[in-house]
Amino acid sequence: MPWRPEMGYHGIACVGGEGFSVNTVLGTMFKLLAVAWRPPTAGPWIEAVVSGMMARDLAEASAALELSPAAIEAFSAALSTYEGADAEEALHAIRREETRLFIGSDPVVENSEGTWLQRAHGVAHPIRMINNHSVAVADFMKECGVVRKGKYNDCIDYLSNEFDFCGYLADGGTLSVPE
């Protein structure tokens, strides 16, 4: 399935074919993870989940990279529970789970590198958005030619953004970068 920028998601059914470099497959894997870690949305994102496409594509990329199946086993298992489900019900359930995992003063999972590092260094109530770790990530991305859009108001070091950036680097940093 070709890249569909209007969806922000692309399939990789042909990834095992000849002519795909390891970097291409690695870039695809990172982009799939970026999509999977973004906040759940109606439309193409949830359709990729309930159709099973997201789980299949992650499994194919993982196999093409010769990763241990255990590397994405739990993630794939979680995604597969929504396969064939009603999209609206699945979206509601996934949003509830996202809130449980990532939101609040003491989230189960820290989805921002800067706040995760602050907690690792003993900061009880880390500052989100602007902290020295997040600024370092933004500076590194800028050195690589990736600059956030003027009105971008999310943490640049959210996992989904960093996965997207790793995909960009795996592709050789040659993708067109929005100004």
Protein language model features and the residues they cover:
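Intrinsically disordered, low-complexity segments enriched in serine/proline and basic residues
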Residues: 1-12
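Surface/interface-facing alpha-helical segments and adjacent flexible terminal/loop regions used
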Residues: 11-179
